Amino acid sequence: LGPNGAGKSTAMRMVTGLTPPTSGEALVLGRRYADLPNPGRHVGVMLDASAQHPGRTGREVLTLAARTIGVGPTAVEHGLATVGLTDQEAGRRVRNYSLGMRQRLGLAAALIGDPEVLVLDEPANGLDPQGIHWMRGLLRGFADRGGTVLLSSHLLSEVQVVADELVIIGHGCIVAQGSVEQLLQQQGTRVRSTDDAALVAALTTAGIEVTASPAGLLAATSSEAVGRIALDARIVLTDLASGSAGGLEELFLTLTAAQSREGMAA
């Protein structure tokens, strides 16, 4: 997860060997992607659903992908069935596909080698609510069978439902990592007052880290401690709640406020 321009797609391109990192290395299954024997049999990749030849049919796209990595024609039919593309749709030119259909085709291409890992950049783009529900079930089933899915998304509610672990990035840096439950538990206390400047000063003097967010101040301590400090400083609180009260969306906005365009504009 991360705001536009945070580096989500760049990170995925580094994982799949398309963009060299300035330092360090990215490993998949313990190796660089380029060092994997026949990578498509181990890692299924969809970074841009529109990156298909518009003049080919959906079936031709999958047939070419299957031949490239050495799998038989039955994988093509299985892939089409898996992503819900009918024979009629498979016979249409990609230029006539909707964005949602291109997403399904791209996912079929990623799955065609029966990989252990999927790397998917915004796989739910263009899907309607039913399609998003279907995508969630497909990826959850893949993971439950022992596979690993690395995906980026801006659909926070869907991520909260399906993800086992989150990596939140901003400006190319990891700002938080862990399960949804772990991240929400670490978020301290959300507070508003009649004099936020004075409250920040009082909390800072007490050695408590305070961050401004769209939902108010976020203090890295318990609500009881914030209330006590505010009382001692004679500051009236108008809102006091666990930092996790706003859920994943508020957590995301808080952690990435400094990197987002909206945060910089504010």
Predicted regions and their residues:
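Residue-level "edge-of-site" marker
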Residues: 79, 93, 215-216, 243
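Short alpha-helical
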Residues: 34, 53, 71, 157, ...
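ABC transporter nucleotide-binding domain
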Residues: 135-221
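ATP/adenylate-binding site constellation spanning eukaryotic-like Ser/Thr protein kinases
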Residues: 30, 40, 58, 171, ...
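ABC transporter nucleotide-binding domains
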Residues: 1-151, 156-157, 161-164, 168-170
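C-terminal coupling/interaction segments
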Residues: 222-266
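Short, flexible turn/loop "capping" segments at secondary-structure junctions
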Residues: 17, 40, 182-185, 211-212, ...
